[in-house]
């Protein structure tokens, strides 16, 4: 995304209110524009989190994309009363990183006697 929304968090309550508007627009109408705004706010932050966990630029890019796809698909079930969007998104990110590590772990092959 060329546009950065990093400063949105400096506005306090207005930022949270705007974020909730975007979430409702996605939940109710599948708003692509709202999804782009929401991704724009969190993309760099989530990418850095994943990169620190994986140490790989390629893996971080792939996982970050996967995280946002999963988040957008799961957004109809998101409830702000249970957790902030940021907390919810980080839980998805952490789970995706754990899943990737499990898949990357070598599978032991039983030793056969000759």
What do these predicted regions represent?
Residues 39-57, 74:
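Amphipathic, Lys/Arg- and hydrophobic-enriched alpha-helical face
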Residues 23-24, 36, 47, 51, ...:
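Solvent-exposed, non-membrane alpha-helical residues enriched in polar/charged side chains
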């Amino acid at each position: 995304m060329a546009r950065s929304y990093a400063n949105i968090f400096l506005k306090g309550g207005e930022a949270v209110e705007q974020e909730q508007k975007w979430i409702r627009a996605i939940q109710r109408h599948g708003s692509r524009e709202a999804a782009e705004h929401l991704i724009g706010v969190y993309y760099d932050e989530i990418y850095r989190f994943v990169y620190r966990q994986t140490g790989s630029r390629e893996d971080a890019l792939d996982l970050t994309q996967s995280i946002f796809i999963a988040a957008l698909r799961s957004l109809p079930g998101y409830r702000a009363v249970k957790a902030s969007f940021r907390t919810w998104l980080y839980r998805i990110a952490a789970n995706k990183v754990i899943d990737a590590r499990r898949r990357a772990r070598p599978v032991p092959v039983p030793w056969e006697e000759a």
